[in-house]
């Protein structure tokens, strides 16, 4: 388009900011160097750690049994593979061989959003042991932060609203408080130690499935 001498020449178009999730994900997935303890005798095994008293190279046998104790399926993995990671293979094999399976009973290590969703979506029931929530030491109990499903917010022990902020890449919805309110909160030391005076509460997008597992735990049938 022609322009007068007094006019400034057109500026080159600004480069559009790329907001595609693939590129963002690629930046997040840059490989990081980490140290792995490996056995020189048997490199295929893994370092099994249980608390602070037990550390040894080992294999784990992830076993599924029926109500009478008969073994239905076993999957062997290195000792550093978590139970919840090995669950899919064991579960898929058992349900393929025994499709009539209705209820899955497991310990608290298997109470993850993914496993809960997988089992209930298959039309089965998952009943797990109690899993203690991870909360700040010496702080408010977890149950004092109440989720309001209708307004999609969290109510703190001081009856203030934590509004939805974002959903992180791990599938957790983050609810954050208003720092202006938290600054003068009488129980802030029991709630958060963040420098910006913001309390963040996370709730997984599949939390409803975990609550179904809790309901099954309180049901005598399971």
Feature names for model-found ranges:
Residues 1-222:
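Anion-binding and metal-coordination hotspots
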